[in-house]
């Protein structure tokens, strides 16, 4: 049997002509494409974030290329990127073999990219438009809730803060009155009228506590025993503690603003109910409402909002799209979560084709709904004489108007129509549940918008957009969470979370674009 020849190992041998990292990266490698695209971008906005103090920084183009390539491959943490620089030749090729620490990468993201993330996200979009991949003439809008990095037990509730603040103010006012009375009975000076006003804030309590403290020090020694003076000083100390606590409550209310909750460790996050509910008990968790617009499954716009419902995000989100690109898209498609009178009016003012569903869009097309004669949506309406006709043929005349205000401050006008003689009606038990004559509430403006939306949604173009919507933003969210494992934010604060999302959006778009071109 012939002797087996084994090639020698050269691991520990020195080479006179060592290979470069360039030799290990194929010419058509994705990392070369990413690096080429990133280096074609304008670097000035990123350079403007450096102050020129201290040691020379690493190349911003190199760092941007490194971070974007990491996000393309699902590596989002600074430690993960730093580890990849040790073991992955593609990352080594980007940095020329430099071993960057996680702190260097973190400073680049948190101190520099955070200030110009929109510029570079837009730069990627410009490349996609130039290549003809997207046109910015259509946008498919949807939202999802992404959990914050904060713990789920760090909640602060607005109602609880307001209740505790009111109780503490009431308790403090009573204690303050008792202290002032005790000072007066023991020879203290009279309380000025302006200092006798009820306390309504932490500053008021602190001012009153200092006044009482000064007067307590000037009391005649013969008037109070040592124990009584100690008790008085303790009561005054409690006033200062109450002032500090009230200051905390007021700070919490400032952070809350119009929100109902926030997280102590991530004050920008709001507690919301998420679909990922392992205990199935409806538990709320700190999260952000992420809104994105897509075209051909590319991100074209993104924003974060503190409110859990999508209705209030529609207008500011489209305004941001207009600000980002200097124009609105010709059409927008969204689900029924965005269908409101305010949003339809906005689309009309912007002259956009809005393929936006409304509540009951699907339900009102079902046979039981259409054949329900007692449903006010099926009542005959005489537009000329402004009256409805009930199932018994009785006219329902207008009897007043009401105004409702949404959370955004938008005012809607509701007209009331009431039948005149419902007593003894054979259909009364089927037609109404309350006593008296039946009253219906009608928003004519919203109904007109709904009719217009129905015609758009059921048109040939509308059917096309409706069939496209489930495979646009919803598919993107599926890829984002299931394929790229981006399910929870890794930063505290709106600015850093937004920066992280921007980098993810850049990576997502480039990953899809490069995948198409290969």
Please place each PLM-identified region on the residue numbering.
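Anion-binding and metal-coordination hotspots
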Residues: 8, 67, 74-87, 98-518
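Glycine-/proline-rich flexible loop or hinge segments
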Residues: 15-19, 44-53, 61-71, 89, ...
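Secondary-structure junction/capping motif
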Residues: 20, 28-29, 59, 266, ...
């Amino acid at each position: 049997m012939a002797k087996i020849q084994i090639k020698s190992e050269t691991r520990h041998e020195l080479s006179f002509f060592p290979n470069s990292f360039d030799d290990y990266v194929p010419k058509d490698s994705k990392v070369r494409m990413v690096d080429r695209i990133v280096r074609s971008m304008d670097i000035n906005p990123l350079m403007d974030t450096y102050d020129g103090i201290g040691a020379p920084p690493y190349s911003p183009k190199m760092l941007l290329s490194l971070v974007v390539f990491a996000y393309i491959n699902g590596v989002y943490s600074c430690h993960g990127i730093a580890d990849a620089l040790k073991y992955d030749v593609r990352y080594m090729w980007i940095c020329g073999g430099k071993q960057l620490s996680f702190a260097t990468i973190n400073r680049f993201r948190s101190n520099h990219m955070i200030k110009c993330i929109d510029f570079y996200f837009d730069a990627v979009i410009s490349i996609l438009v130039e290549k003809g991949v997207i046109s910015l003439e259509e946008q498919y809008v949807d939202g999802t809730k992404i959990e914050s990095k904060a713990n789920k037990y760090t909640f602060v509730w607005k109602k609880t803060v307001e209740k505790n603040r009111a109780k503490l103010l009431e308790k403090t006012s009573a204690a303050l009155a008792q202290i002032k009375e005790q000072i007066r009975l023991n020879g203290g000076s009279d309380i000025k009228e302006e200092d006798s006003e009820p306390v309504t804030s932490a500053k008021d309590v602190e001012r009153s506590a200092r006044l009482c403290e000064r007067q307590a020090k000037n009391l005649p020694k013969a008037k109070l025993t040592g124990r009584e003076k100690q008790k008085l000083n303790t009561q005054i100390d409690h006033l200062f503690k109450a002032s500090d606590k009230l200051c905390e409550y007021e700070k919490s209310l400032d952070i809350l603003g119009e929100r109902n909750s926030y997280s102590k460790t991530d004050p920008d996050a709001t507690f919301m109910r998420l679909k990922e509910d392992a205990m199935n008990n409806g538990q709320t968790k700190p999260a952000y409402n992420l809104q994105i617009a897509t075209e051909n499954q590319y991100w074209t716009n993104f924003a974060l909002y503190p409110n859990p419902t999508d209705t209030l995000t529609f207008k500011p989100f489209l305004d941001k799209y207009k600000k980002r690109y200097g124009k609105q898209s010709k059409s927008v498609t969204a689900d029924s979560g965005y269908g409101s009178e305010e949003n339809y009016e906005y689309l009309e003012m912007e002259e956009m084709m809005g393929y936006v569903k409304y509540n009951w869009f699907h339900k009102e097309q079902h046979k039981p709904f259409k054949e329900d004669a007692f449903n006010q949506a099926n009542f005959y309406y005489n537009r000329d004489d402004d009256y409805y006709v009930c199932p018994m043929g009785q006219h329902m005349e207008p009897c007043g108007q009401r105004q409702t205000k949404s959370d955004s401050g938008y005012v809607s006008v509701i007209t009331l129509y009431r039948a005149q003689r419902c007593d003894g009606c054979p259909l009364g038990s089927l037609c109404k549940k309350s006593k008296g004559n039946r009253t219906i509430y009608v928003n004519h403006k919203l109904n007109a918008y709904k009719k217009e939306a129905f015609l758009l949604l059921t048109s040939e173009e509308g059917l096309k957009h409706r069939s496209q919507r489930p495979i646009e933003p919803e598919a993107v969210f599926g890829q984002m969470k299931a394929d790229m494992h981006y399910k929870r934010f890794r930063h505290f604060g709106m600015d850093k979370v937004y920066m992280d999302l921007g980098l993810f959006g850049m990576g997502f778009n480039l990953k899809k674009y490069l995948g198409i071109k290969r």
